[in-house]
């Protein structure tokens, strides 16, 4: 929020940068009052032309956009129809801790949405019936976006959580990295890290896990913040099969999500940024440091976007 108005969602026309539609501000359907922040990224289902957006106000929005694009004139329009809203309340939800609301981005597979929330819940929701299929306890304020992976024909999720000061401890707390059966919500394995934290700068995992492909197909990569003290962290390479640690890269803590990049022969490297302004490039199999580029004296919270041979 600012002098310019209340936080909300903007639907922007990328052809002319005009604002086509806004929603989400001061929504009376929210159980979190006037809070209307949207930290995650939206998804649009092309087949149904539906915008799907979980918000920190504790509402999942489903909006039929009725998009029209005229190729000849180069014009784009939307005419949003009826908005469907879903909300929830957790068994430990309160205004002091374990808040309602989603700060992660949703993952969707065949009509099912997977999302974590501030209250330590990983939820699987049927988008056609808006009924919960299962809920798994993620212990703490969870901002890590669930990552879907099909392995031998079965769907799994990789996800983690953070450590918000005072909710579970004022000292240290366990932050697991989980592999979850996406059909049942059952925990397949977890690998635990003991983390510290600061008020407002949480330890644990704030990033999205990267699933390796090609030569890195056996591994996942996750940045874990504040593992030994408030300044330190690791990029962990874990085996998908059992969660065992293949290697770790220790540096300043990172909220940045790792990105796997590949050569034409399928060999892979891992790129991530940390809290002292470094961009680190590592061999994905061994963890050997390939290069470090210092671009800032401050924290890089953003994650690299990679296209061809360039990273932004």
Please tell me what each predicted stretch does.
Residues 205-210, 219-236, 248-284:
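Loop/turn-rich, solvent-exposed surfaces of beta-rich toroidal or solenoidal domains
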Residues 1-16, 27-29, 38-73, 80, ...:
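Active-site-adjacent structural elements in enzyme catalytic domains
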Residues 2-6, 57-59, 120-121, 163-168, ...:
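Short glycine/acidic-enriched loop and turn motifs that connect beta-strands
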Residues 13-16, 65-68, 126-130, 181-184, ...:
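Short loop/turn segments that connect beta-strands within beta-propeller blades
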Residues 47-49, 110-111, 153-155, 217-218, ...:
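Short coil/turn segments that connect the beta-strands within blades of beta-propeller domains
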Residues 3-6, 21-44, 75-107, 134-151, ...:
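Extracytoplasmic beta-rich repeat domains
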């Amino acid at each position: 929020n600012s002098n310019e108005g209340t936080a909300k969602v903007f639907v922007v026309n990328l052809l002319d940068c005009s604002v086509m539609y806004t929603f989400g501000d001061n929504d009376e359907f929210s159980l979190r009052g006037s809070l209307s922040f949207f930290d995650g990224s939206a998804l649009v289902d092309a087949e149904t032309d539906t915008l799907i957006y979980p918000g920190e106000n504790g509402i999942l929005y489903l909006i039929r956009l009725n998009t029209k694009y005229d190729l000849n004139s180069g014009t784009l329009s939307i005419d949003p129809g009826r908005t469907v809203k879903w909300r929830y309340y957790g068994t430990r939800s309160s205004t002091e801790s374990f808040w309602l609301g989603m700060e992660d981005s949703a993952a969707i597979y065949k009509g099912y949405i997977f999302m974590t929330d501030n209250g330590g819940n990983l939820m699987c929701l049927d988008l056609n019936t808006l009924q919960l299929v299962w809920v798994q306890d993620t212990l703490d304020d969870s901002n890590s976006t669930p990552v879907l992976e099909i392995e031998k024909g079965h769907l799994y999720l990789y996800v983690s959580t953070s450590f918000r000061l005072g909710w579970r401890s004022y000292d240290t707390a366990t932050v697991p990295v989980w592999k979850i059966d996406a059909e049942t919500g059952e925990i397949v394995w977890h690998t635990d890290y003991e983390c510290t934290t600061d008020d407002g700068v949480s330890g644990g995992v704030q990033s999205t896990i990267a699933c390796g492909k090609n030569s890195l197909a056996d591994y996942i990569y996750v940045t874990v913040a504040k593992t030994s003290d408030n300044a330190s962290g690791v990029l962990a390479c874990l085996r998908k099969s059992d969660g065992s640690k293949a290697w770790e890269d220790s540096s300043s803590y990172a909220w940045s999500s790792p990105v796997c990049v590949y050569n034409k022969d399928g060999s892979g490297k891992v790129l991530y940024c940390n809290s002292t302004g470094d961009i680190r490039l590592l061999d994905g199999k061994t963890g050997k440091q390939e290069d470090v580029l210092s671009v800032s004296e401050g924290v890089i919270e953003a994650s690299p976007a990679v296209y061809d041979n360039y990273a932004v």
